[in-house]
C-alpha cells in the first residue's frame, strides 16, 4: 500500500532534469534509497512508459515515508479560489503551496492500492490526522469519483463518504465539492 497525503505540488520543471529512469512511486524511491531518503521533489513515471512523466513532492518521513503529497497549504501564498481546469491540471509550486491535479492523482491512484492520509495542524500547534486504508480517484469520464476505504485516526474527513465516495461536481474557493 502506498500513502498519498493531502498536499500540493508544482506542475512545471525543466525537462532536462528528468532522470533517465524515473521511479513509478514515492514508495519505490523510499524502498530503493532506504532510511536516508530525503523528503523532496522527484520525477515519477507511474506507468513506466515515459509518456506521462511528472514531478511530485515525496514525504519520506511521515508514516514511514514513501508518500506522495498531493496538496499542501501553509501560509495562504497561493490562491485556491480557481476554476475547474486548474483543479484538473494542478497549480502552485512543489516547494510551497500546491495542488497536484485531479488527472495526476487519478493516474497515481487508479489501482486503489493506496492509503489516504490527511494531516492537519491549527495555529496553536494542535495536530490531527485522518487515514483511509484504500484511496483512489477515478477518471475524468467518471467525474473523478473519490474511492475511500475504512477510516482510522484522530479526525474524520467530514466531506468524504466511505466506500461510495462522490463525484467531484465543482470547485468553490478552497473546497472541492462532492456529490
Question: What kind of feature is each model-predicted range?
Answer:
Residues 2-179:
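Mature extracellular or lumenal effector domains of secreted proteins
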Amino acid at each position: 500500500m502506498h500513502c498519498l497525503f493531502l498536499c500540493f505540488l508544482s506542475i512545471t520543471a525543466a525537462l532536462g532534469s528528468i532522470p533517465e529512469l524515473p521511479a513509478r512511486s514515492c514508495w519505490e524511491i523510499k524502498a530503493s534509497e532506504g532510511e536516508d531518503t530525503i523528503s523532496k521533489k522527484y520525477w515519477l513515471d507511474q506507468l513506466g512508459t515515459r509518456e506521462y512523466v511528472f514531478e511530485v513532492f515525496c514525504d519520506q518521513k511521515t508514516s514511514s515515508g514513501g508518500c506522495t503529497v498531493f496538496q499542501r497549504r501553509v501560509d495562504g501564498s497561493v490562491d485556491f479560489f480557481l476554476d475547474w481546469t486548474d483543479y484538473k491540471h494542478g497549480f502552485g509550486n512543489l516547494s510551497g503551496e500546491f495542488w497536484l491535479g485531479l488527472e495526476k492523482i487519478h493516474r497515481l491512484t487508479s489501482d486503489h492500492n493506496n492509503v489516504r492520509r490527511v494531516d492537519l495542524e491549527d495555529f496553536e500547534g494542535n495536530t490531527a490526522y485522518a487515514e483511509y486504508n484504500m484511496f483512489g480517484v477515478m477518471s475524468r469520464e467518471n467525474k473523478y469519483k473519490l474511492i475511500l476505504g475504512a477510516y482510522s485516526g484522530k479526525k474524520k474527513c467530514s466531506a468524504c463518504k466511505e466506500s461510495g465516495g462522490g463525484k467531484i461536481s465543482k470547485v468553490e474557493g478552497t473546497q472541492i465539492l462532492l456529490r
